[in-house]
Design a protein with these regions (language model features):
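Signature of the catalytic double-stranded beta-helix
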Residues: 70-87
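Intrinsically disordered, low-complexity boundary segments flanking structured domains
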Residues: 22, 33-35, 76-78, 160-163
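Nucleic-acid nuclease catalytic cores
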Residues: 67, 84-108, 112-174
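Generic structural marker for isolated residues within well-ordered, non-membrane alpha-helices
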Residues: 45, 78, 148
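Charged, glycine-rich intrinsically disordered N-terminal tails and low-complexity linkers that flank
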Residues: 1-72
Length: 174
């Protein structure tokens, strides 16, 4: 049993470029699929180039609107979850590092306590039919499964709950 180390005490004080720079210090949860060769967004080589500072500037503008929408809707996704479950998720705005495997770093959307256990909440949004592939029937896309395993390992929590808002009404949260 362990507590994760804190790499950055408050990520809300970082600029986007500073945050990206800290992310080059290790492998984050969203990097796990690229490492394993199953990321729909980047190859292992792309990830390597990001980590050695060859692609940071180029990556900042790539798909920024979709990323910004996803970030802004995290609070809404959590509010829908709160109404459905009568729980109180909470944010811990730190960047963590695994104490035994220091290359593993992560920051998380939210935590929630359910039945005396601590879970991570990972918020996703998808507003195109193409990006809904993998979510059908209660499934989670494989690249997100790897992200979740990475996050659970860094945080040392009991589990992870993925929330995906795929439309513009509360019934579209899966």
């Amino acid at each position: 049993n362990y507590e994760p180390d804190v790499l950055v005490e408050d990520i809300t004080t970082l600029s986007h470029d500073e945050w990206k720079l800290y992310r080059t210090l290790g492998i984050g949860g969203s990097d796990a699929a690229a490492v394993c060769g199953i990321s729909p967004w980047k190859t292992a080589r792309d990830l390597y180039e990001e980590k050695v500072h060859k692609k940071i500037k180029e990556q900042n503008d790539d798909g920024w609107v979709a990323k910004e929408i996803g970030k802004r809707l995290e609070e809404l996704v959590v509010q829908i979850f709160m109404k459905r479950t009568d729980t109180r998720p909470y944010a811990v705005r730190k960047m963590f590092r695994h104490p035994l495997y220091p290359f593993m770093i992560s920051d998380f959307d939210f935590f929630v306590k359910l039945d005396e256990k601590i879970y991570l909440l990972e918020c996703k949004t998808s507003f195109s039919y193409h990006h809904m592939n993998g979510w059908e029937g209660g499934n989670i896309p494989p690249h997100y499964v790897l992200q979740g395993i990475h996050y659970m390992s860094v945080a040392n929590v009991d589990g992870i709950i993925f929330l995906c808002l795929h439309g513009n009404h509360e019934g579209s949260l899966i």
